[in-house]
Amino acid sequence: MSVHIELPTELRPLMKRPLGTLYRGKGRDTVEKFVGELASPTKLISVGDVTTFHLLEAGIIPDICIVDNRTKRKPVSRDVSDRNRDKVYEEVSVDNPAGIITDELIKTLCEAFDSEKLLRIFVRGEEDLATLPVILMAPLGSVVLYGQPDEGVVFVRVTEEKKEEIRVLFEKLISKNQNTELDKIRRILDGHKDP
């Protein structure tokens, strides 16, 4: 049986606010606004199909990209899905239903951060909540980029302070789920390799 964390209704408004700096705009113009801020991150991670597409179109190759071939709950265009299948990436697939973070997703992310390969994680379901464990698991100095629907791209520099902010949010999610099996997820997110 899969262990998972479900996003409760009362915490959904928290997930609508940007977790970092919001760069407003659309397309490649938005990428141009923050490209100077990238400054050789430890790892560059993109979450979302449209964000990944515009990075690749601008010649910026994330170390890890997390996609589900959907945007705003609708299929992405063929151009976007084709571009996101860039040949530089090795692909890994994972099941992760909408509104949930599964232990399978977290284990896949753990393996991705341990790898030196460029990875495309294809999520069967929804990748939106992956941003939380990504920030917690990414090495310090990494940059996480994800789309804020109809607004732009959110730029998150991974610092100890940012990890602590996300850890507090994660603890709220875990406490609302009331499942002793969630200790497995907590241990992985705290850096333990044994689930």
UniProtKB/Swiss-Prot annotation:
Manganese in keyword set: no
Name the UniProt record assigns to this protein: GTP-dependent dephospho-CoA kinase
Keywords: Coenzyme A biosynthesis, GTP-binding, Kinase, Nucleotide-binding, Transferase
Biological processes per GO annotation: coenzyme A biosynthetic process
Residues that bind GTP: 49-50, 68, 127, 150
Functional summary from the UniProt entry: Catalyzes the GTP-dependent phosphorylation of the 3'-hydroxyl group of dephosphocoenzyme A to form coenzyme A (CoA).
Species, as recorded: Methanosarcina acetivorans (strain ATCC 35395 / DSM 2834 / JCM 12185 / C2A)
Catalytic reaction annotation: 3'-dephospho-CoA + GTP = GDP + CoA + H(+)
Entry EC no(s): 2.7.1.237
Pathways per UniProt: Cofactor biosynthesis; coenzyme A biosynthesis
